Amino acid sequence: MGADVEQDDTEQYLKQGTLAVLGVLRELLQNQTPMRVSHPRGQFITRLLHVDKTNMVIDFGSNDYDNQLAQEANELHIVADTRGARIELILTSLQMSEYEGLPAFTAALPGQLKMIQRREFFRVDAPLNPIFFCYVPWPDGTGEGRLRLQDLSIGGIGMLSEGTVPDALSCGDTIKKLRLEMGEYGRFVVDAQLISIGKHSVVGSKCETVVTPRLSLRFLSLNAAQERELQQVIFSLERLARDKAKRFQ
């Protein structure tokens, strides 16, 4: 599944007016939630530094060229994912400024924003190269399994087994200290709950159908720092997928 959810799994709420918009943005500020700023010529990851009834201040991106392009853009789309909803808003421009002595962008507080609440979280597919692995201590104490990460969200993961899974494994089981090894994006150790056990089918090199177990889990214990880091990974993987798609157009 890509970086979207099915329409039936979403409820869209338009927040209008200063107080409603300010309330949502203050929560993003308090949680230091990463935000993706996109425009026709590029994108970058940032965070809110300050927000009040008239303006919002966001941090500079890490690349000077990206910052220059953002300053020249006439319309910028902002996306931030929380555990409860995806926040989307549009800014007409960014102005260079300073915040606490460091360069920043200032924009007028938007008159509205969209909150997309869902039963399912937005998921992004994990890359096939390099492969990311999940190391799963089986709840029945029979050892540790290595599974391939298939997709990732703030809410949980989908993973594919390279072999069989323990017969005693069942939905609702808690997996302690699940380890995600994601190469350059780092390692995450979290507790998770098994939501479903399914099957994943692909066509093999000899045109045969290969069926492997697929496990879906939801995270139980992400702290604020892990959530921010995981969101950065998701944004990076989304960008990687878009860049790859453009090359094959």
Swiss-Prot record:
Superkingdom as given in the UniProt entry: Bacteria
Cystine bridges: none
Job of this protein: Acts as a flagellar brake, regulating swimming and swarming in a bis-(3'-5') cyclic diguanylic acid (c-di-GMP)-dependent manner. Binds 1 c-di-GMP dimer per subunit. Increasing levels of c-di-GMP lead to decreased motility.
Protein name as it appears in the record: Flagellar brake protein YcgR
Cellular localization per UniProt: Bacterial flagellum basal body
GO cellular component: bacterial-type flagellum basal body
Gene transcribed to yield this protein: ycgR
GO BP terms: bacterial-type flagellum-dependent cell motility; regulation of bacterial-type flagellum-dependent cell motility by regulation of motor speed
UniProt xrefs under HAMAP family: YcgR (MF_01457)
Family affiliation: Belongs to the YcgR family.
Keywords: Bacterial flagellum, c-di-GMP, Nucleotide-binding
Summary of subunit composition and partner proteins: Monomer. Interacts with the flagellar basal bodies.
UniProt GO MF annotations: cyclic-di-GMP binding
Organism per entry: Erwinia tasmaniensis (strain DSM 17950 / CFBP 7177 / CIP 109463 / NCPPB 4357 / Et1/99)
Xref: Pfam families: PilZN
Domain PilZ intervals: 117-236
Taxonomic path: Bacteria, Pseudomonadati, Pseudomonadota, Gammaproteobacteria, Enterobacterales
